[in-house]
């Protein structure tokens, strides 16, 4: 099947590459010439495990191409996936200008039937705006060309996006006409050979499903973080509590790990957008408002623990950081807890020496003008002469360190673990002072 993907960012590039990998003929469009030049020269502009190999394989096979030419992309595919950004506006609502612009470009250039598929995360009612933009552009041309609009939200986890796309737990299709549904069913047939994963529903329900899923996961994170803070106060161990409640099959263990808050490109933005959608509809989501407030506060937990132990004035002190990305297996630092911690430490006069296996280049871009941040080549090098270590991201390589070596390299044998990676007894037996989240 011929497919066009408008937007060669995270969602668009992963979707286009995976669809090409099962035999489709895919063209990815982006208005960013540098991004397309990078892709056409064999580079990958984002870090995602497995993406480089799948892109190169399908480019070589001739099934995946990249362009900045809108007319070429619109002419190519019967399926036109819109996978552009929907950044938060000042009021928290999703900014749909890029989605609507993509729809208008399709309307200006289409010559035959198209299925326009919203792949971007968008609020309820966006399909109506897409449909209106298409209709206006066709009317301006005096063209009577049929089209369908479909909602097909993505459920990709950064760091596991290829696996999520190739082996989905569900495929949500929101559509109101049989022709579009049949084309989408044909498209996704290779991804559901073992069992039926395709859920068809009306468009508004599909649009809400994506936001609802992310909001539910964010709620679990904030709830566990709140419980961890209570455990800190009461002297309970949140790890034992987690095991006790997670063993209940009605609850389970997914997203039940306390820490220092969620970040990234999805949860913060989508929670804010759903809160705004609900408020505009006259049905405010009080629970979700609390979730967002709790997450914002949780990002200050690690700075607070450091200040309680070392004092408010950190001038002359160096804090080592393990982890910069908002989660493992990505270089994404958007809304990352590390940024809150770094900014607090710098304001208090500290120096920072950070290590991250993937996100260092992104951190150097963000903090290019900050001379008090240094970057280490490996985890242990970050510890040399540091007054404390703060663990911010739960990369696997941090899970089994040599605690004796850590103690020897730290100026002050002090660890603040924002991800509860260790049994507290283990670093303490090595002579390290260890502070975690909700653990005595």
Residue ranges and their predicted role:
Residues 1-440:
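Structural/interface elements that position substrates and couple domains in central-metabolism enzymes
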